């Protein structure tokens, strides 16, 4: 297949592109700085800054574009950047798809379990209604834009992704804290943490590219979510480091502001559709996932 990945220079995009390249697919990666990314990346692919630079028909599109939610405070200006980098960019992508003589067969669009907001103890399958906080509203608007691809006759899947454990994202800074003897939970760590190993995220996306019966939202989270304190205690055990710092949640608010919601929202997601599909999990539990990732590094 000829597969277009937008946001192809990020942690997830690069991991997916590497796997798809090894499987023999033809790749086009969209980035704001294609020349720089082409020099950095070892993946054989065409890099483009403009969608109109793509000259060959595309069979599948994986949309992973979007500014980082955590790096900067959520000022009104930053919220606009976060919104536009997802909704407006996805709208432009759909406009490009609509103008193709041969539209893609499948469209996988980024999303997040933040769709559900803070669900407490409730199990969130793909049928669960969306939350009301700002991150949830952002994800819901992103999905609402993406599903319009169905009007083009394109099978559309929404990748409701949990925190991905791998060489990027949440895990590396956590490991540094633990290795420095500063590891700990957040408050009591009682909130649910719906994680996924990068290998399973890539494997699930590959399965969704070819499984023609699946459409709509799909939870990309491991089948065994844990409370956050179990995640940190397991990480400490794997790294042979103590887990003793547990700053109260109220202490995070002055530093992180609204971004605290990203860290402490309780989301107990269940990958109902992936399980029904018969997806074989490489790392279904947090102990095996962290052991693998810490051993690799």
Predicted regions and their residues:
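Conserved beta-loop-beta element that borders a ligand/cofactor-binding pocket
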Residues: 111, 144-167
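Glycine/proline-rich active-site loop of Rossmann-fold NAD(P)-dependent oxidoreductases
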Residues: 140, 152-154, 165-174, 208-218
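C-terminal amphipathic/interface module of NAD(P)-dependent oxidoreductases
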Residues: 261-297
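NAD(P)H-binding glycine-rich loop region in Rossmannoid oxidoreductase-like domains
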Residues: 36, 41-92
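N-terminal Rossmann NAD(P)H-binding glycine-rich loop of SDR-like oxidoreductase domains
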Residues: 3-23
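Mid/C-terminal beta-alpha module of Rossmann-like enzyme folds, strongest
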Residues: 2, 211-258, 291, 297
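Conserved Rossmann-fold NAD(P)-dependent oxidoreductase catalytic core, especially the SDR/UDP-sugar
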Residues: 91-133
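Alpha-helical substrate-binding/gating segment
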Residues: 175-183, 191-225
């Amino acid at each position: 297949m000829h597969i277009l990945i937008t946001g192809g220079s990020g942690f997830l995009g690069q991991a997916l592109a590497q796997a798809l390249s090894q499987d023999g697919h033809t790749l086009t990666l969209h980035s704001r700085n294609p020349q720089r990314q082409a020099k950095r990346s070892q993946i054989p692919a065409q890099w483009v800054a403009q969608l109109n630079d793509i000259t060959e028909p595309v069979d599948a599109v994986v949309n992973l574009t979007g500014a980082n939610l955590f790096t900067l405070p959520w000022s009104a200006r930053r919220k606009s950047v976060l919104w536009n980098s997802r909704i407006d960019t996805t709208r432009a992508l759909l406009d490009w798809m609509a103008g193709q003589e041969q539209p893609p067969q499948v469209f996988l669009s980024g999303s997040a379990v933040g769709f559900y907001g803070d669900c407490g103890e409730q199990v969130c399958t793909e049928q669960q209604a969306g939350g009301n906080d700002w991150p949830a509203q952002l994800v819901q608007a992103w999905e609402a834009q993406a599903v319009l691809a169905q009007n083009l006759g394109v099978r559309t899947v929404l990748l409701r992704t949990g925190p991905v454990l791998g060489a990027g994202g949440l895990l590396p800074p956590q490991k540094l804290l633990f290795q420095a003897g500063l590891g700990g939970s957040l408050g009591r760590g009682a909130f649910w943490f719906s994680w996924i190993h990068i290998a399973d995220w890539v494997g699930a996306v590959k399965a969704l590219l070819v499984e023609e019966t699946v459409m709509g939202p799909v939870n990309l989270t491991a089948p065994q979510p844990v409370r956050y304190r179990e995640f940190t205690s397991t990480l400490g055990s794997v790294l042979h480091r103590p887990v003793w710092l547990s700053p109260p949640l109220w202490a995070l608010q002055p530093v992180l502001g609204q971004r605290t919601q990203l860290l402490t929202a309780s989301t107990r997601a269940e990958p109902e559709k992936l399980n029904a599909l018969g997806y074989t999990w490489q790392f279904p539990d947090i102990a095996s996932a962290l052991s693998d990732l810490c051993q690799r590094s």
